[in-house]
Amino acid sequence: MNKSVEKDDKLEKNSSFPRSVLSVSRVEFGLREDNPEAKYCPLKLLVKDGKQLPSGLQGHVFIISATGSVDSKSRDDNKDIVFPSSDGFTPFYNGDGMVYRFDFDNLEEGVFLTTRIAKTPCYYADAATNKCQPNLRFKNRGIMRMSDELGIRNQLNTGFLPMKFSQEDNERLLITWDIGRPYEIDTKTLEAVTPVGWDRDWRAFNPLLAKLPLQPPFPFKLVQTSAHPCFDENTGEMFTVNSGRSLSTFIAQLRPVLYWAFGLIDSIRNPSPRGFQKAPDQKNFFQKLAAAFKQTIHLLWSLLQSFNIFANFVYVISWDGKEKINKWQVTHPNGCPIAIKQSMHQIGLTEDYVVLMDTAFKFLLEEILPAPNEPKYEEIEKWLSNLIDRPQLPDSTIYIVRRTDLKSDVKKVVARQVVIPRETTHFLTDYKNPNDQITLHLAHVCAWDVAEWIREIDFSNSDNNGGLPHMFGMTVGPLDISRMGCYVLDAKDAKQIKVARSDLTGVYADNQPNKYCQDTQTNGKEYCKYTWGPALYAYRENPPSGHFENIYWSFFGCWEDIFTEEGFQMYQNYKYRAIPADEVRQLTKKGIKSNLLRLHIADLDTLEANENRLQIQDAYEFDTGYFGNSPQFVPRAGGTGGYIVCVVYNGTDEQPDNGNEIWIFDAADLKSGPLCKLWHPQLNFGISVHTTWLSKIGKRTASYNIPVKQDYEYLVKQQPQEIQEFFNEWVYPKREPKDSGDCSVS
């Protein structure tokens, strides 16, 4: 049977999310002079349906995606293809970052794709321990990958930041994620060259994740920062944050002890017959006793830390691309440290202010604590998960820091706090702030918890999902309709200014949406079908006006197979619920399609009385079973306007195109559909995340560089001899064993 026909039969309903996201290729494509580890030359992408590439395409589009880990389960017939979340516990966004660069600079020859994994020092540690030193091996724990001896991986799989310093010809490029130092990559070779700041410049998220009692500090500590730092090309400064907090709950720390107790009870109820066939192993007994004592010490120490409010901290960091980073601790006006309860996934920057936000991407420390991955513990783990888990905060707490306060002779700065109703993961700020008024563009992810993912424990053994594989690892879908907002804040008085109707909701009874917004129905009620799950965004860089006029958003839609009963119960009584929870259940079962739209933000001077500042002016709805993601604006060469390039998934990876395509739209006419679609039999994405565009690329010439050995040596010297030798053999020289035979080579 034709595979594409078979795929269409299985994916009749929009509620079937594309299974092509379940697999990803870890192959690196590139020129050997740029990347000696590249397995193949750059891919020349194919154009579908005999279409032509738009002649105005130019420059280079960069896309980032998590691509599994060195020990991810691979396909039987192709070891390069892995299934990162097949264990039923690991989210898609736990994995090595793969950089994809699409070159549109020579359209006569075609579009070429170069890829490379972002290989930080901890990557080489991960690769070497996996094959050569299993006692130090890294394992997946929730969003993180961790070794009990070496610490936390910095996987760099979320975002980019272009930086154009006035004294340099080419743009430089940072690669980022929420829990690791940003790294600069070479835009031509895609190599991860250097971190920003020395390891000792960055404070660990929590003392527990930097140093355990009676043990040396981890070589790789957990650092929480922002996946979206900012760059001011007018002043040549990059801004980001370094934040941390005390332990979120004491209950979470009981998980290992509870499992130990359950295991003891199980062994008493069901003693092994083999246990009576020989005398007890005294050495093994004392090892277990010592381990239990050590665990008790750790537990008591963790309890003390959970009550230490001074473990909460936020630093604003600035960097000029050449010298040591500068940092300032941010406090409330009363001098108390700021406590970020979730994350600082994104920050904003204006000409006079740094805007910080406690964003709705919750990071729970309890996710990383060890839990047995065994069927007999599934019910226990489900009970513990429901006990520990909590919904994201329903409001957006914002902290405003004046840039003129960031002086070299001070160590602390004061922030003013503003709270905006409804939660936010992504937001943008206008650069101009006339009269100290800051304009924020927010996508309210109402009851959409992107930090929750589909797990094996969410399903019963009898649930066969219609013969399709479960969407393990995928972010759960939205549980209420979303809202777009544009707000003006008075930075001096730290309050919101009411200037016009500036929030767009898809609930007709609340606010009649503009005429473009088509509807979906349930129980005779109509709702806008476009505003479900604002995921990722794109925009034209540096608008001359200094404020955003159009922002392109990809919306998730609703899908039955990424709906969980646990998530539904957690958000059933959501504070700002717009659509009754039972109706959301019905809408999700029916399915709401993914879409790409253009949100227009009107100038305040052009508005009439009671007119909404926000308007959906153009939109494209993807076909049933298709999911569009990661939009990027590309300016048109030699003219105005531009294009939107995005990733589109459909079907399964058994199709000739692996169910992965690159679609190109006219940015001024989304509704007419893609101008062309690109594909290749070897193009196999995981879930893509953020993007960027550069007009040109070039070999990195900046002198800033932090050597690996000098960066980590102060920590490695405190380690046992085994770990010191391990770093000398594998991490410092950036060596990666290809098979177990390489382990004996020194």
Cite the ranges covered by each PLM segment:
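Beta-propeller domains
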Residues: 1-746
